UniProtKB/Swiss-Prot annotation:
Pfam families: PsbH
Function: One of the components of the core complex of photosystem II (PSII), required for its stability and/or assembly. PSII is a light-driven water:plastoquinone oxidoreductase that uses light energy to abstract electrons from H(2)O, generating O(2) and a proton gradient subsequently used for ATP formation. It consists of a core antenna complex that captures photons, and an electron transfer chain that converts photonic excitation into a charge separation.
GO biological process, one term: protein stabilization
Cited SUPFAM superfamilies: Photosystem II 10 kDa phosphoprotein PsbH
Protein name, UniProt field: Photosystem II reaction center protein H
Gene: psbH
Superkingdom in the source lineage: Eukaryota
Similarity comment: family membership: Belongs to the PsbH family.
A GO cellular-component term linked to this record: photosystem II
Chain segments annotated as transmembrane: 42-62
Organism encoding this protein: Chlorella vulgaris
Subunit structure: PSII is composed of 1 copy each of membrane proteins PsbA, PsbB, PsbC, PsbD, PsbE, PsbF, PsbH, PsbI, PsbJ, PsbK, PsbL, PsbM, PsbT, PsbX, PsbY, PsbZ, Psb30/Ycf12, at least 3 peripheral proteins of the oxygen-evolving complex and a large number of cofactors. It forms dimeric complexes.
Principal subcellular localization: plastid
Modified residues (Phosphothreonine): 6
Post-translational modification: Phosphorylation is a light-dependent reaction catalyzed by a membrane-bound kinase; phosphorylation occurs on Thr residue(s) in the N-terminus of the protein.
Amino acid sequence: MATGTTSKVKVSDTGVSTPLGTLLKPLNSEYGKVAPGWGTTVLMGIFMALFAVFLVIILEIYNSSVLLDDVTMSWESLSK
């Protein structure tokens, strides 16, 4: 039968309680619950947009699209 069990181990005997697990237990107390509404979705979108702007700035510096004084992007300058 697919629902039968083969071991005599109790569920409570399978885990070990550690100080770290006890410390982190409150973080898992809301498991499975979903906040109503949009929650922090807008905040996440703002941070994603800021991160995208950051990546574009880094790409432009790397491609020398943005000229900065005393900033060179070459392997020779890194070896000095």
